[in-house]
């Protein structure tokens, strides 16, 4: 469930933020904000589904997933292919997220 929650949250957050970007930077209608706000609310809800004891740890691990998802958005939606530095950076971030998620926790 955690992986699905993180991936869904990332897509919802990016879509919500992109709606504001489209309105303010691409001269789209202000009505783009309506689904953007709904998407951002969905993002916040989905993070509550992550199985973790502390919100801060959930958000920290989510950061790596968000970065990778943002690069996929860059490629799939905006049509700009990530370069090797983007991919190396995303791999480092996902590695950090994995350490946060799966690292052994002492009592």
UniProtKB/Swiss-Prot annotation:
Name this protein carries in UniProt: UPF0060 membrane protein Sala_0701
Lineage, uppermost ranks: Bacteria, Pseudomonadati, Pseudomonadota, Alphaproteobacteria, Sphingomonadales
Membrane topology, record value: Multi-pass membrane protein
Highest taxon above the source species: Bacteria
Alphabetical list of Pfam families matching this protein: UPF0060
Compartments where found: Cell inner membrane
Main location: membrane
GO cellular-component term (any): plasma membrane
Residue intervals passing through the bilayer: 4-24, 30-50, 60-80, 87-107
């Amino acid at each position: 469930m955690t992986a699905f929650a993180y991936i869904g949250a990332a897509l919802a957050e990016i879509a919500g933020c992109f709606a504001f970007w489209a309105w303010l930077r691409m001269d789209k209608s202000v009505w783009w904000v309506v689904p953007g706000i709904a998407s951002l609310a969905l993002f916040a809800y989905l993070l509550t589904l992550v199985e973790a004891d502390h919100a801060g740890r959930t958000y920290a691990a989510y950061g790596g997933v968000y970065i990778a998802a943002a690069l996929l958005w860059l490629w799939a939606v905006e049509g700009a292919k990530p370069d090797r530095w983007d991919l190396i950076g995303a791999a480092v971030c996902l590695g950090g997220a994995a350490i946060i998620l799966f690292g052994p926790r002492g009592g």
